[in-house]
């Protein structure tokens, strides 16, 4: 447990000793005279010379892409519990900001998110799950800041080009409709809007976007640019007065706690508008704790936003478990409140947007950092971190070596804080299980002597919050159900008359968009189906495949039988597939291997070892046309695979040596309309 040492009056020492007997299970806190303390650094916290920059909050990203995909399928009460740990004030991560992807139909890291406008004359503000997530966040914290940012765009905006700036007015219109729709259909006020995630910005587009926002009465919506690097946008703003005027926040990604001179010269708010992206182990928590402090200490960034909010996607997709917490098993209800949640709480539960950093923040003498914030009404929060190099490496950028060692740190409260009588203390220690504590409340610290100082003994990988606020809480629920594998028998007939979400449970679209569909041409068995709805390639953010594909199941499945009814809508050139042992997804989807069983409207079939269709195991002619339902069956057992069409054998015992395991999948030959029904898988590992 932490040893933190206080220079205090005799009255406080007596109080501490008498209280110790009744404090079983709480922190052991020895209090010593100043004269007995080991030498160490002294740090003054003072507002006499004014305050630093305004604090804008700590948040996280849902999307970029499909990172919350499995969350929506969780049964209650577990889904609500997960949301409470993320958003409920004074309970868990208690986030101030939620940033969501404006779905654009393209692959954006771990899947695709649907656009509200698949086609030029199409508008639907109930697709996907980001609307729902924003409402759930607002339900828990009405003051939460909402941000929207596009990663990809629907293809029609590009007019044949893979570029969103072909028609600046049209792209601005598309983005503004999303903001207007959020308010009209969901009563959500979007606070900030971004440009194009980690891709090129267009200065004229930003200016047009501002004008169009104003024309719709959306003057309150502020613009963040450019969600990439500091350099280009900052330099451009210094040279372009109109651009300078319309950009409210300069947002950089993975800045390594540093900003650049041009960004600071603008005087604009500086944000780390995407950061973290690290496995949510204790090392990830150390990364998060270090950058939450040092983004301001080193770079004057007043907001830090984590990618991603919750690791709610299949773990074997890229960046598995790189969320603040993990919720990737809706079939079992199991979830894990990971240590980054409690590291977040050290800042989020004891500050609010609109507070101000003190000017007196900085680095500790023997490693680590400290920040202090105030609401200007007498409240003070101090956050101290001593994260070691070994246990605080983020996924990027490269972290130069630094050393952290045991030290004594004396903090002196001056200015309006000199008369503060008491500070609440919250503590985290990362590392060995026997020494590990997460967001533990310690005995409060009384400051009864006249100089308002206290001394802490700090060791590596620790996090302290000392605050005048008494509202902190480590929320908890009964443990969720135990972890379970994806069911080895899984069926979905897609018979949902009024679906709450547009996507079927557990299917994770990797290229294309698969939605519940009411087939008015078939009032019978196939009245309700799952349909691939994109008819052109989106303006991509990643390397989307040339085929559409949605994965499902357990990545460790080896032997399985997949059966599905399929319906090709495109004559002559159309085609569909079912697949097993699919070994890649996300931004790697183009190179996915597996066993793919295709049929085509031109009367042919094919069996391939990859999604791209380069590895051909078998091919031939078959009686297949468009606009007819067929049943495909794919059986994979050991080193061999077989396929059936309408329950009749079409090909048998084809050798398949690689891959050994992977997901099940459905998809289409190109960006084309097609339907799927009565999906059924039987699997063994």
Swiss-Prot record:
Domain of life: Eukaryota
Active site, per annotation: 198, 274
Substrates-to-products reaction catalysed: a beta-D-galactosyl-(1<->1')-N-acylsphing-4-enine + H2O = an N-acylsphing-4-enine + D-galactose; beta-D-galactosyl-(1<->1)-sphing-4-enine + H2O = sphing-4-enine + D-galactose; a D-galactosylceramide + H2O = an N-acyl-sphingoid base + D-galactose
Transmembrane segments: none
Coiled coil: none
Main enzyme class: hydrolase
GO molecular function, one term: galactosylceramidase activity
Main subcellular localisation: other
InterPro entries, A to Z: Aldolase_TIM (IPR013785), GH59_C (IPR049162), GH59_cat (IPR049161), Glyco_hydro_59 (IPR001286), Glyco_hydro_59_dom (IPR035394), Glycoside_hydrolase_SF (IPR017853)
Recorded disease: Defects in GALC are the cause of globoid cell leukodystrophy (GLD); also known as Krabbe disease. This deficiency results in the insufficient catabolism of several galactolipids that are important in the production of normal myelin.
Function: Hydrolyzes the galactose ester bonds of glycolipids such as galactosylceramide and galactosylsphingosine. Enzyme with very low activity responsible for the lysosomal catabolism of galactosylceramide, a major lipid in myelin, kidney and epithelial cells of small intestine and colon.
Name this polypeptide is given: Galactocerebrosidase
Species this protein is from: Macaca mulatta (Rhesus macaque)
Gene behind the chain: GALC
